[in-house]
Each structure stands twice: as C-alpha cells, then as structure tokens.
C-alpha cells in the first residue's frame, strides 16, 4: 500500500473490539471542563459492538443513511447522508465498519476520504473498522482500497481470517494517535498476548494468510451470497422486498418494506419454520429517530451451507407470502 511504517505507527491489541473501547473513551465522553465529546457513527445500521464501547452512553450519535433503491432488481444500498452528517468541535471521534456488519455495505473510497476530510478540519480521528476488509480476511466482493491518512486509524482483526481465539487487533495510524491508544491499553492490560501474535506473524510473513484470504475465504462467502440472492430472486412473492447489495462481510441484509408486523414478530414466525435470523432493529441501537425502516430489516448469516441457505430462503419467502397475504385478506 506504499506505506512507510515504524513500530510507532502500529498498536497490537487483544482484539479490535478493544480498540473501539479505547478510542471511544480516550477521544469521546466528557472532558475535564465538562464538555461532551461525541462518538459519531456516520451511517446507521452498524455493528452492535459500538453500542457498549463508551462509558458515557450519551456520547454516541448515529446518522440516518440515504437509500439507493433499484425497484426492478429488488436491491438497495445505504450511503452516508452528507447533507445531514455533522462533524464539528463537539466530535471526539468517528467510527464505522467497512465492509459493514450487519449489511455487507462498503462505504466507497471517495466517501471515506470525504468523512476523513470533514473530521480533519477539527482534528478528529476516524476509526475505520476493517474486520472484513483486505488484505485479510479480504471479505470484500467489490473493489475497495484500505484508506490511510493523518487522522485515519485503520483497524484490523484476524478473527475472520482464522484466528478468532487469539484475539488480535491491529491499529495503523499516526504515531500521536497510536500513542494515545497505547497509553489507554497500558492502563488496561499492559500489552496484548504475545503467543497469538507469534502465530499471526508466521502466517503473515509466509504470505499464507493473504493467500488463504483471497483464494479460500473470499470465494467461500461470495458463493453463499450468490446462492442466497438467486434463491430470493426466484422464490420471493410479489411484495416490496429489497436485498442490500452484497459488497462484503459474512451477512446478507434484507429489507421487507411495509412489513405488516415488527422485525421481532417476523423473527418469531421464521423460528416456527426452523429459520433463524437476527431482527434488524438490533443494529439501529443508537439511532433514536422514529423510522419505520428500523423494524423492517433482517440480518441473515452466511455461515450455513449453501444447501441450508437456499432452503432457508425458500422458507422465508413462504412466510413472507403468508404474512403479507394475511393483511390483504383482513382488508377484504
């Protein structure tokens, strides 16, 4: 990536989740003068793990996205709404996942640059959660370039690249910002475990980890998102359903517009036919605005086999048909 890095640019933590805890409380929360510095999520829904990172819950602030909808293909995509997004002197830091858990969304290179530029005006660090990004685990199905910059802290994890139990998080950024996070970690646990790092160092230096990511992990999940999408295209009834563009990560995100019940109620209906999903409202944890869309989405894991995914989507389509049809019948 053309970077000139020293050990002062890098921090190893006990998993990337720890990075967001350090950042949210080092850069966000109340200052000594009593001013509240906000932890901004520029696009919601996003990773639920951010919901508990701040010891000052009121510091978290999330923004509603814009929706690009393809009515014909039954697809849609979230984008940051720059007409609403505010980063100012009250902002402590910005955090977002790329690719995104839960939606599989990839904020574009240009959008990342724009967010970083807005934040740079106020010396605000931007943490890009790259747990699913290249170079490993490389769980992106669309072109994306890891972004670096003076105020960008690039946060990586090896959990999805085959080392979940070792809890290895990697932060790459400006030495001044890395130093702040390092001081926070020193108070918390001195340093992260060395044993997992030794395993990772061997896998990285040999080139095997990058090869595994590109030639095994990425194709494995890319096939599954295709199976899921193709099955929904064939099986879904004539209702306003939209699948988020499958751009990365290990989840699919389904929006059932005008769903006649809540996402939690639909989740219970799916359980009755042996299909387990996660109600989407879980991922709008900070977003307090009343928005019906929040109760109309589902996160679907891609960890099952291709056969199981196809069968589950057929069952989901049948349940959706029954639920929407029951409303039509009740209106007559």
Name each region found by the language model.
Residues 11, 36, 55, 65-71, ...:
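Conserved core segment of the aminotransferase class I/II
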Residues 174-175, 255-257, 303-305:
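Residue-level recognition of strand-loop junctions within catalytic nucleotide-signaling folds
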Residues 215-229, 240-256, 293:
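Conserved glycine-rich beta-strand-loop-beta hairpin in the small C-terminal domain of fold type I
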Residues 3, 108, 272-273, 284-332:
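PLP-dependent enzyme catalytic core of the Aspartate aminotransferase-like
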């Amino acid at each position: 990536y053309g970077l000139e890095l020293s050990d002062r640019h890098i921090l190893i933590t006990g998993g990337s989740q720890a990075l967001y805890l350090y950042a949210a409380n080092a850069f966000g929360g109340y200052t000594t003068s009593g001013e509240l510095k906000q932890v901004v999520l520029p696009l919601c829904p996003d990773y639920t793990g951010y919901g508990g990172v701040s010891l000052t819950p009121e510091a978290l602030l999330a923004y509603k996205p814009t929706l690009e909808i393809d009515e014909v293909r039954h697809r849609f995509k979230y984008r940051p709404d720059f007409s609403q997004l505010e980063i100012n002197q009250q902002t402590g830091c910005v955090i977002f996942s790329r690719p995104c858990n839960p939606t599989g969304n990839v904020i574009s290179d240009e959008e990342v640059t724009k967010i970083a530029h807005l934040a740079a005006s106020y010396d605000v660090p931007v943490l890009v959660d790259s747990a699913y990004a290249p170079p490993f685990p490389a769980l992106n199905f669309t072109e994306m370039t890891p972004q670096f910059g003076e105020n960008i802290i690039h946060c990586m994890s090896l959990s999805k690249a085959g080392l979940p139990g070792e809890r290895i998080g990697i932060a790459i950024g400006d030495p001044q910002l890395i130093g702040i996070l390092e001081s926070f970690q020193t108070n918390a646990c001195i340093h992260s475990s060395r044993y997992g790092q030794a395993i990772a160092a061997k896998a990285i230096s040999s080139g095997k980890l990058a090869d595994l990511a590109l030639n095994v992990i990425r194709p494995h999940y890319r096939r599954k998102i295709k199976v899921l999408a193709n099955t929904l295209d064939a099986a879904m009834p004539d209702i306003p359903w939209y699948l988020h563009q499958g751009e990365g990560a290990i989840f699919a995100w389904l929006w059932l517009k005008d769903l006649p019940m809540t996402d939690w109620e639909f989740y219970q209906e799916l359980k009755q036919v042996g299909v387990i999903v996660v109600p989407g409202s879980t991922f709008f944890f900070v977003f307090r605005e009343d928005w019906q869309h929040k109760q109309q989405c589902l996160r679907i894991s891609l960890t099952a086999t291709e056969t199981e995914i196809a069968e589950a989507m057929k069952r989901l389509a049948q349940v959706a048909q029954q639920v929407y049809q029951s409303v039509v019948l009740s209106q007559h």
